[in-house]
Amino acid sequence: AAFGAAALKLPTDATLIVQPLWGSIGFTLPAAYGAQIAAADRRVVLIVGDGAAQLTIQELGSMLRDKQRPLILLLNNEGYTVERAIHGPEQRYNDIALWDWNRLPDAFAPDVPSRCWRVTRTHELREAMNSSVASDRLTLVEVMLPKMDIPDFLRTVTQALEERNSRV
C-alpha cells in the first residue's frame, strides 16, 4: 500500500506516515493506532494491504477498545502483491489465508459499533467513502483488487530490480 500511497495528492493539512525503508510489512496498523492516540482530534485514514494487516490485526481490537474511529482501506489482493511483483506472480508463498474481513471488528469487540464495507466497483468505493467521512465509529472498507494490480511506481521499481539482477 505504501507504493500507491506515495503517489496520492493529499490536502495540505494531511500527514502521510509510511515506513518503506526496511520493507516492514505490518507496520501501518499499529502505527495508525499510535497516530490516533497522538492526534486524537484528527481522523486517521489507514491504507493497508491484506497481507500486511494479517501480521498485526490484533491492533484492530485495541482501536475498537479505545473507541478510535479510523477509516481503514484494506486493499485485498489475496496476498503479498509487492512480493509477487518482485519474485513472480505464481509463487505460492505469496498467497495468504482468505479472511472474512468484515466480520473481524465484531469478533474483536462485539459491543463496539463499527461499519464495514466490501467494494468491488468504483461507485461502491465512492459511496463507502462518502458515508464514512463523518462517521463516529471505526470504518473498514475492504477494497477488492486483482492479484497483480500494482501502482506504476512499483512497476518501475520492480523493472529496475529485474534489469539489475539480470546483469549479475
Language model region names:
Residues 3-168:
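Thiamine diphosphate
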